[in-house]
Design a protein with these regions (language model features):
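Metallo-beta-lactamase
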Residues: 27-46, 139-209, 214-217, 294-322
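Pre-active-site segment of Zn-dependent metallo-hydrolases
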Residues: 66-112, 117, 122-126, 187-196, ...
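Conserved beta-strand hairpin/beta-sheet module of binuclear metal-dependent hydrolase folds
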Residues: 44-99, 202-225
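Membrane-interface motif at the C-terminal end of an N-terminal transmembrane signal
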Residues: 14-34
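Active-site-proximal loop/helix segments of hydrolase catalytic cores
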Residues: 193-261
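N-terminal Sec-pathway targeting helices
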Residues: 1-19
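Binuclear metal-ion centers of metallo-dependent hydrolases, dominated by the metallo-beta-lactamase
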Residues: 134, 146-163, 256, 260-337
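Active-site neighborhood of phospho(di)ester-bond hydrolases with catalytic His/Asp-centered motifs
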Residues: 70-71, 107-116, 136-138, 221-224, ...
Length: 337
């Protein structure tokens, strides 16, 4: 009994120290000033390919006719303790609907998911249902969609490397790896429709992908998690990389296997914010997991690569020089094949 009591006290003390450390890191937010100093702004123009970032690796790409949303995550269940205790969570549909309304998103052609952890995939089925979109991702992502009530006719399980055409977007999912020594726990697959509420750890990894999006105005690579499959991106090209920067342990190697392999000279860091905080609070780097200061220090050693950051929820034209003058903006569906 004494031993058990001692272990319990030790655990409580360690949790208390962790809470203090997390609170301190949240106040310090190392690297946040550098992030703000690299802000990229280019006002949206008719016909332009634009990007809007919504925290973590959630990214909206649209060109006035068609729109795709990658890794939507608006619910953001609050607090670290529920995450540690693996409590039950579920998509907050009213919050999702409000976020879509604020973002002027009433219709999407496709929702893409890079892997099936909750911070990338939990909201995906609901977003697809609310916007009339197809859901594209792994078999695990498909089961998240089914759990949200999305019919199979609106779900497409992707095969690595296959080209998928959505309007003027050409999309390819490339097999990758999750960041971190654990390989991305919880690993494994979601093998049946995931009904919610479900626990954090029910959102198993499934496949992990880089997503290449090609468009007549330019090409972007969405690399949401800071792992990589050696050589997987060889022979591909992207002008710009949206690069996940959580759990980076070897930045030079990471850049070689992502940014350098695709020949990009522009990088936008994503997946750095504390997603246990709601989007209506100021963003902070995720404590103990993200060191923006180290990322920017490392990028200073690669001056040929331009680091640009996006303001939360603010739309920006990605390739201003490629925008046709006076191009009309219109709404339309997608041809997917």
């Amino acid at each position: 009994m004494k031993l058990l009591r001692g272990l319990l006290i030790t655990v409580l003390v360690l949790l208390g120290l962790l809470a203090v450390a997390v609170a301190w890191l949240r106040t310090q937010a190392p690297g946040l000033e550098a992030y703000r100093a690299h802000r990229y702004e280019a006002a949206p123009r008719p016909g332009a390919l634009t990007a809007t970032w919504y925290g973590v690796s959630a990214l909206l790409l649209r060109d006035g006719e068609h729109a795709i949303l990658i890794d939507p995550f608006f619910t953001r269940p609050e607090g670290l303790l529920p995450l540690v205790l693996n409590r039950a969570i579920e998509p907050d549909e009213p919050r999702i609907a409000a976020a879509l309304l604020a973002a002027r998103i009433d219709k999407l052609d496709a929702v893409l998911v890079s892997h099936s952890h909750y911070d990338h995939a939990m909201d995906a089925g609901v977003v697809a249902k609310l916007t009339g979109a197809m859901l594209l991702g792994s078999a695990s992502t498909a089961n998240i969609g089914r759990g949200a009530g999305l019919p199979d006719g609106r779900i497409r399980r992707v095969e690595p490397g296959e080209p998928i055409t959505v309007g003027r977007f050409r999309i390819r999912f490339i097999a990758s790896r999750h960041a971190g020594a654990s390989g991305g726990r919880p690993t494994g697959d979601i093998t049946a429709p995931l009904r919610t509420p479900a626990h954090y750890l029910d959102y198993k990894l499934g496949g992990t992908y880089s997503i290449l999006v090609e468009h007549p105005q330019g090409s972007v690579l969405h690399h949401g998690s800071a792992g990589w499959e050696p050589g997987a991106l060889a022979g591909l090209h992207a002008d710009l990389v949206f690069l996940g920067v959580a759990l980076v342990d070897d930045l030079p190697a990471y850049l070689r296997e992502t940014v350098d392999l695709v020949g990009a000279r522009r990088v936008v860091p994503v997946h750095w914010d504390d997603f246990t905080l709601p989007l209506d609070q100021p963003l902070r780097p995720f404590p103990l997991v993200v060191r923006l200061d180290r990322f920017f220090a490392g990028m200073a050693q690669r001056p040929e690569i331009q680091v640009q950051t996006l303001e939360l929820g603010r739309e920006a034209t990605l390739f201003p020089a490629s925008v046709p003058s006076g191009a009309p903006a219109s709404a339309g569906g997608a041809e997917m094949r």
